[in-house]
């Protein structure tokens, strides 16, 4: 330890009433680095732990149950319950924002999650926020989507999902602001706005989604390695990556944050470089194919499929991949709801989402369509015998650019590991939140002294063993199963958010409440939520059709159905099981019976109008550039 002494073990000296308070550095020290979390001893100490305690002993002691007394919470912070609804790639960004505040909402409520340590710094949050969305769905899953739909179908699918997502962000932002301290976050909205059974089923399917993501990413990592070698058993790499992910999570939030900082730096640099290089290759400035332009939109074509029905199926199949790629984007509305001026931040977050959809997703997808033909035998999901690779690698390597594809593939591997790391971390925390909501056994609420939900982490680790199918010849089939579960689960969550918003607005109207009580009103209103809800139901119906009658086949296929639609039977089973167990057969909560007061923050309508008028006046009297920034940002 350094000469600054061990801040984590400062004791009461000579039993006096004077407390020695730890400095802000406490927040940066994980427990297993520090030792015991015991209550202050009545025996005098020199102000730090005795030196004869070994590092090994302190490490093993850190796995003991965390005490939940007031004196033991000096280093603990309230983990906001909204983490149950946050995507892995962004989940810890909210933890940081809560840590930055000295008066966290709901602090010291006695929740088990109070023991989770606050160790994430602003630099971590910045890179985690920027890297959100750059994962398997965008970097690898788009290969299968391109094969099924063609470049135009892929673009249409992402554009449709992008329009839906914008409405979801608006609805989520409105409810996140008024229910900012609700246990369970937006996974809890359906429970008191729609129906308890529906809320239970959606919450568990959402947890299952992130349980599936970890083995999905590990399988994807082994597939990414095949670009370099196919002679080594893929399970060897799965073991290496599996141990790496668990080791990172043994170090708790601090290990997660540092790993994500490195991973996301690499992802941002790679995507920026690919965008620039892709344009140069397409116009003939690099590679050996000269000017390419939109050649592949004519040969082999903009859509895959000889008949219109096959083309439609291709677009429908793309929507699930797009949902998986967009997964977690709703988190932006959650975090902005907790900033100093959320009423102004949420509209900015919606604009930010538009820019992310346009530049991060649609722009790179257009480039992929220009540079990679959908009939390439190297694309995942193709029937050719070529070595499968990410479409981003193929986009560069197939045009004669050397060395760079290896760097891109390496960064894609890091991106995949980043998602595996995030999903493992988050699935364990989801189990913790389900336990606090009463939806899971209390054993999952076990928190050790280092702030790790050990039992939940053990379940996540066992589930990740599915990844060892990587050596199986059915590897791509397993990838399809896991991707379908994750993608459909995301659609269920988004549908639940929009349906909850519709019920919330209906209850406000029936009970005679003014919308002026809301700190922020969705710019798309109930019509936007209705559009998003209807579109997602239609997508689920279309996906059902694709599942029972796969693309290119005219006959029904039971195996293909479960490969692509397994999440739906799981949701139905959970819903019916809850209804049978609780003998509760009502379909929904009546609008006049919905509790609009509990957990809700009610804003002063007159004060809001005054603030809005003052803001507009400042813009009118301020410099022109501020009006430009306000319009675009």
Curated annotation (Swiss-Prot):
GO cellular component: a single term: endoplasmic reticulum
Organism domain of life: Eukaryota
Ranges of Polar residues composition bias in the record: 34-52
Keywords associated with the record: Amino-acid transport, Cell membrane, Isopeptide bond, Lipoprotein, Membrane, Palmitate, Phosphoprotein, Transmembrane, Transmembrane helix, Transport, Ubl conjugation
Residue ranges, Extracellular side: 146-148, 219-231, 282-313, 374-402, 474-477, 553-560
Pfam families xrefs: AA_permease
Transmembrane residue ranges: 125-145, 149-169, 198-218, 232-252, 261-281, 314-334, 353-373, 403-425, 453-473, 478-498, 532-552, 561-581
Listed PROSITE patterns: AMINO_ACID_PERMEASE_1
Keyword Nucleus applies: no
Region (Disordered): 32-52, 86-116
Induction: Induced by transcription factors DAL81 and STP1, which are activated by a signal initiated by the plasma membrane SPS (SSY1-PTR3-SSY5) amino acid sensor system in response to external amino acid levels.
Modified residues (Phosphoserine): 6
Record's bilayer topology term: Multi-pass membrane protein
Record location of the Glycyl lysine isopeptide (Lys-Gly) (interchain with G-Cter in ubiquitin) cross-link: 11
Molecular function per GO: amino acid transmembrane transporter activity; L-phenylalanine transmembrane transporter activity; L-proline transmembrane transporter activity
GO terms for biological process, alphabetical: amino acid transmembrane transport; amino acid transport; serine import across plasma membrane; transmembrane transport
Primary location group: membrane
InterPro entries according to UniProt: AA-permease/SLC12A_dom, Amino_acid_permease_CS, Amino_acid_permease_fungi, APC_YAT
Gene3D superfamilies found in the cross-reference section: Amino acid/polyamine transporter I
The record's account of how the chain is modified after translation: Palmitoylated by PFA4.
Remarks, miscellaneous: Present with 21100 molecules/cell in log phase SD medium.
Protein purpose: Broad substrate range permease which transports asparagine and glutamine with intermediate specificity. Also transports Ala, Cys, Gly, Ile, Leu, Met, Phe, Ser, Thr, Tyr and Val. Important for the utilization of amino acids as a nitrogen source.
The name this protein goes by in its record: General amino acid permease AGP1
């Amino acid at each position: 330890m350094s000469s600054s002494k061990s801040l984590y073990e400062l004791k009461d000296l000579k039993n006096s009433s004077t407390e020695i308070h730890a400095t802000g550095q406490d927040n940066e020290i994980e427990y297993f680095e520090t030792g015991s979390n015991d209550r202050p001893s009545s025996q005098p100490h020199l102000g730090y732990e005795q030196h004869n305690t070994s590092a090994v002993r302190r490490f093993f002691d850190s796995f003991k149950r965390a005490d939940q007394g007031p004196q033991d919470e000096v280093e603990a912070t309230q983990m906001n319950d909204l983490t149950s609804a946050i995507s892995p790639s962004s989940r810890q960004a909210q933890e940081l924002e809560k840590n930055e505040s000295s008066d966290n909402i709901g602090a010291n409520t006695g929740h088990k999650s109070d023991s989770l340590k606050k160790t994430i710094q602003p630099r971590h949050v910045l890179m985690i926020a920027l890297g959100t969305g750059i994962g398997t769905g965008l970097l690898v899953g788009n290969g299968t989507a391109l094969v099924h739909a063609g470049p135009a179908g892929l673009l249409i699918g992402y554009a449709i999902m992008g329009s839906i997502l914008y409405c979801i962000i608006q609805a989520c932002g409105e409810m996140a602001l008024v229910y900012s301290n609700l246990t369970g976050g937006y996974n809890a909205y359906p429970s008191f706005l729609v129906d308890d059974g529906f809320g239970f089923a959606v919450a568990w399917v959402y947890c299952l989604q992130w349980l599936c993501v970890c083995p999905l990413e590990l399988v994807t990592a082994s597939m990414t390695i095949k670009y370099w070698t196919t002679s080594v058993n893929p399970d060897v790499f799965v073991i290496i990556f599996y141990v790496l992910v668990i080791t990172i999570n043994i170090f708790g939030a601090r290990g997660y944050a540092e790993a994500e900082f490195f991973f996301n730096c690499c992802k941002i640099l790679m995507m920026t470089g690919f965008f620039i290089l892709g344009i140069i290759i397409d116009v003939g400035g690099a590679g050996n194919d000269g000017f390419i332009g939109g050649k592949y939109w004519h040969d082999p074509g903009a859509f895959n499929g000889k008949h219109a029905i096959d083309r439609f199926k291709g677009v429908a199949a793309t929507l699930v991949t797009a949902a998986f790629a967009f997964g977690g984007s709703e988190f932006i509305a959650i975090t902005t709801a907790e900033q100093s001026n959320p009423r102004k931040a949420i509209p900015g977050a919606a604009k930010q989402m538009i820019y992310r959809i346009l530049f991060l997703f649609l722009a790179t997808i257009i480039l992929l369509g220009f540079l990679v033909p959908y009939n390439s035998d190297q694309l995942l999901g193709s029937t050719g015998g070529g070595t499968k690779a990410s479409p981003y690698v193929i986009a560069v390597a197939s045009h004669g650019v050397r060395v760079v594809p290896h760097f891109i593939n390496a960064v894609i591997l890091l991106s995949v590991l980043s998602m595996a790391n995030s999903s493992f971390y988050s699935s364990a925390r989801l189990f913790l939140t389900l336990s606090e909501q009463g939806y899971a056994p209390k054993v999952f609420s076990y928190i050790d002294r280092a702030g790790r939900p050990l039992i939940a982490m053990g379940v996540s680790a066992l589930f990740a063993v599915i990844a060892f199918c990587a050596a199986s010849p059915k590897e791509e089939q397993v990838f399809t199963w896991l991707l379908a579960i994750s993608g459909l689960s995301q659609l269920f969550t988004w549908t639940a958010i929009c349906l909850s918003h519709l019920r919330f607005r209906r209850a406000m109207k029936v009970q005679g409440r003014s919308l002026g009580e809301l700190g922020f009103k969705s710019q798309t209103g109930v019509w936007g939520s209705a559009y998003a809800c209807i579109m997602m139901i239609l997508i689920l119906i279309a996906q059902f059709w694709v599942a029972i009658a796969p693309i290119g086949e005219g006959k029904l296929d039971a195996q293909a159905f479960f490969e692509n639609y397994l999440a739906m039977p799981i949701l139905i089973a959970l819903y019916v099981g809850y209804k049978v167990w609780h003998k509760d057969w009502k379909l929904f909560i009546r609008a006049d019976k919905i509790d609009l007061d509990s957990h809700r923050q009610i804003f002063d309508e007159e004060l809001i109008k005054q603030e809005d008028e003052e803001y507009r006046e400042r813009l009118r009297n301020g410099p022109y550039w501020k009006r430009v920034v306000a319009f675009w940002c």
